[in-house]
Structure formats: C-alpha cells, structure tokens
Amino acid sequence: MTEEVILKVGLTPKHQCSYLGHEQEQLLVLMDHNLLNASGYERLLTAGFRRSGNDIYRPHCPACSACQSLRIHSERFVPSRSQKRIRQLNQDLELVLSYDDKPEYYQLYERYIRERHHDGSMYPPSRTQYKGFLHCDWMPPLYLEMRKDNRLIGVATTDLLPHSLSAMYTFFDPAHADRSLGTFAILSQLDLAKRTGRTWLYLGYLVEACRKMNYKRQYLPHERLIQGEWKNIDTKPE
C-alpha cells in the first residue's frame, strides 16, 4: 500500500531551462521542514524530488516533462564492457570516505569548473556557490575521495540514506580525464551501496535531449520515474 503524504511546497517563477534552452523551467520547492532529515528525504526521492544545498525540489514545468528521476538497483546492476574497463583502469586508486569538507576539495572543484565547465552556468566557481550547492545543514554529505599516491585527483559527493545513496556531484583533476573518473565515481557508489546493504543509487534527473544529462542511461538496468511510476529499463537506447 502506498502512503499518501500532503506536502507544503512553493513554486518558483518561470525561467529559462539550463538543460533545454528553448524550454521554460519551474520548480516545486519543499516548504515542510518536518521532512528535512535522511529518512524524509529518502521518501521524497521516490517521488522524484532532489536536493540542492539545504533545499529539496522537483521540476514542475508548464510544457515539458523531459526530466526523469533515475535510480539503479545495486544488486541488479550489470556493468558494460567499457564500465568494467574503467573499473580495472582505476584499480590503482585509493578510495577514502569522509564527512569532512577538506580545503583541497574546493581547490580541486575550482580547477575542474574552470577547465571543464567554463561555458556553463556554474562558471565562474566560488566558495559561496560550492557550499550553497553541496553543503547541507540538516544532513551532511559523504565525500568519496579518489587518491593516486595519496594525491587527491577526484571527489564524489553523495548522500548516505537509510536504504539508498543519492549521488550529488563529482569533480576531478582535468589532467586525469583519460581515467573516466565520473563513470568510476558512479561505479564506486554502486559498490558502496551494495557493500552496505543499500538498495538504490539515485542519479538525479535524466534528460534524453541533453548530452550532459543523458550519460546516466548507460547504467543498466535502471529505473525511471515516468508519469508517477517507476519503470524498469534494461536495454540501451537505439
């Protein structure tokens, strides 16, 4: 039986979509602070919500439904040949978990944004932007460090929830782009979910028509929230 919950939400003004420039975007923003905890947020994830900083939101666009929440079952996931190669390529890295936001994280983030996303909405990077996006007062994120010979070359931020993980953002040293650390970060979070008995890894929103957002469809099988129901997807798009 599905439990119905009445939520108090606000609606942002319309503005240009950052994924599909020809569309107008509006967001539902949670106003009910009773759900600002790990278990409450996990329930909201199943309904298509997402965290950014302290805020929880969900797309509520007037003429578009391109954003689809996507999640991967940690036990059912089957890596592709290329994903297996990426995992093998990065076996020389040390993975370290931390709840402390270390100064070297921002230094790496700043370099990543300047060199990889200088044409995007996150440029120029700033400490205020970094904290406002990743930090959360009611649930500190977990940082998954990727180190080579003790040198930090990548960080994946994720929310560790009772029965799932929710991937937030990954940034890395552009000098190591050939390692495909973004893919490796997702594979590592799936490994962490499986190792700790957590069922799902949430990857946020898939937008098929946006190159920066459609990479998520390569992790199979996965589920997408379509018209209020989670649908299993087990084949690659044509």
From Swiss-Prot:
The keyword Acyltransferase appears for this protein: yes
Listed under catalytic activity are: N-terminal L-glutamyl-[protein] + L-leucyl-tRNA(Leu) = N-terminal L-leucyl-L-glutamyl-[protein] + tRNA(Leu) + H(+); N-terminal L-aspartyl-[protein] + L-leucyl-tRNA(Leu) = N-terminal L-leucyl-L-aspartyl-[protein] + tRNA(Leu) + H(+)
InterPro entries, sorted:
Acyl_CoA_acyltransferase (IPR016181), Asp_Glu_LeuTrfase (IPR017138), N-end_Aminoacyl_Trfase (IPR030700), N-end_Aminoacyl_Trfase_C (IPR007472), N-end_Aminoacyl_Trfase_N (IPR007471)
Point out the coiled-coil segments of this chain: none
What subcellular compartments does it reside in? Cytoplasm
> Which is one GO molecular function term here?
leucyl-tRNA--protein transferase activity
Keyword Acyltransferase among record annotations: yes
- Keywords in alphabetical order: Acyltransferase, Cytoplasm, Transferase
Q: Name one GO cellular component term.
A: cytoplasm
Its Gene Ontology biological processes? ubiquitin-dependent protein catabolic process via the N-end rule pathway
**What does the record give as EC number?**
2.3.2.29
Role of this protein: Functions in the N-end rule pathway of protein degradation where it conjugates Leu from its aminoacyl-tRNA to the N-termini of proteins containing an N-terminal aspartate or glutamate.
> Record's family?
Belongs to the R-transferase family. Bpt subfamily.
Q: Which NCBIfam families match?
A: PRK01305.1-1 (NF002341), PRK01305.1-3 (NF002342), PRK01305.2-2 (NF002345), PRK01305.2-3 (NF002346)
> Know the name of this protein?
Aspartate/glutamate leucyltransferase
- Gene from which this protein is expressed: bpt
